[in-house]
Amino acid sequence: MKKWILAFALVYSSVYAQENKFVSYLKNNKTVLDLNGKTQWEQLKSDAEQNQFLILGESHGAQDAQLIDFSLLKYLNKTIGTQNYIAELDYAQSSCINEYLKNGNETILNNVFRYWVKNNAQWGNYDFYNKIIKIRALNRTLPKTKQITFSGIDKVQDFDLYFKLIDKFLGTKKNLLLDSLRLIVNDSYNDSEIIKISVFAKNYFEKIEKNRIEFEQLFGNQLPIFKYLIQNLSYSSTKKSGVNRPEAMFRNYKELYSILHFENKKLYGMWGYFHSHQIPVQFVGEDFASKLVSSDHPSAKKVISIVCLPIDSKYNVWDSKGATWIKQPFSYDDKTLLQIDGIENLKALTTNNSTTLFKINSLNSPFAKTGQLFNGTAPQGKLMGDFRRRDFAYQYVILMRNSDWLNPLPKTF
C-alpha cells in the first residue's frame, strides 16, 4: 500500500512539475492586447523583422479575430513596412478588394461579399466587411508606396467573378486562340460543370505553352497573371487535377511570389486554423503553411505562425433547417468542439474579456515538440501533430476570451 501511495505521489509530483514549467514560462512570455486602443505587439517585433511571412491563424466565426487581424496588420505596416496581404481568397476576389481600396466603390466590394451571403458562408459578415473599410481608411493616410494590397492564392471560390476578371483580360482582343476561352467565360456558371471547366483550363494552359510567342504578343507583361488565372482554374476539380485545396494554395503562393516579385517584401495574411499550422496533423496530412515550411522555397525558413484560440466565446453557425444564422458556444476547452492540450494554463493566466498574446518559441521554451497548445481532443478523436521535423506548430498563441460572434450580413445584402 505504501509503495502504491509513493508511486502515485511521484507521478503526481512529476505531472505538477511539468505543468508548473509551462505556467512559469508563459507568465514571462505574455502580453495583454488592447484591441480598442494602443495595442502592444512589441513582443513579436523581432520575429517580424527577422522573417518574411507572418500568418495569423483562426477558426472562422469569432469577431475578435477580425479586430486582431486589423490591429496586427496596422502594426506591421507601420513598423516593418508590410504592404502585401496574402489572402485566403481567389485572385478575382482580391482584385475586387484592391479596386475598392483604390477608388472606394462599395458596389465592387458588395459584389465580393454578396457571393458569401448567397452561399451561407461565414465570411459574409459585417465584421470582415468593416475591416476592409478600415484598411481603406488606413491606406488613405499612407503614401502610395506604403499602401496595403491583397493577393488571393486560394482555389476559385466565386466562378462568376473569376470569369469576369478573365474576360477583362481578353477585352476586345481578336484571335482564334481566344475564342474557346471566351465561350467558357461568357457562359453562365453551373456547379455541375466544374469537371468540364477544370479539364478545359488544363488543356488551355497547355495551349498557351505551345503558342507562347503569340500569347506574349496578345498579353504582353500581363501574360504571367493571365497564365496564373488559367492554371488555378485547372485546379477547380480536385478529382481531375489531382490538386487538393492546400496544394493549390501552396502552388499559387509560389507562382504569385515570383510573378509579383515578393522576394524582398514583407508578407502577412489571416488564414483558417489548419492552414496556418507548420506541422502536418497525423491522419490528416499537410496544409498550406506546413507544405511551405517543409519546402525549398526561399521563404520557407522565414515563416511565423500566430494562432488564435477561443475560450468562452461565440461563433456563427448556419442552421439549414431554419435557414438562418445561430450563435453557438465557441471554446477550445470543450471536447464536444475541440479541447486543446494545455489551454487551461492560458486560461489561468488571463482574465475574462481579454485578448492575450503568448510567445511559445523563446529560447529554452518547454513547448518544443511537446504538442502542448496544439494536440487536442475532438468528437472525431485525438488530434495529434507530427513534430518529427519541426519543434513548433506555431510560434505564438493568442487567447481570445469572451469574443462575440461574427455579425452576419442579411440575406438581402
Describe each region flagged by the PLM:
Residues 41-86, 91-98:
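An N-terminal structural lobe/cap that precedes and organizes the functional/catalytic core
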Residues 59-63, 90-94, 155-159, 273-277, ...:
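Solvent-exposed loop/turn segments at secondary-structure junctions
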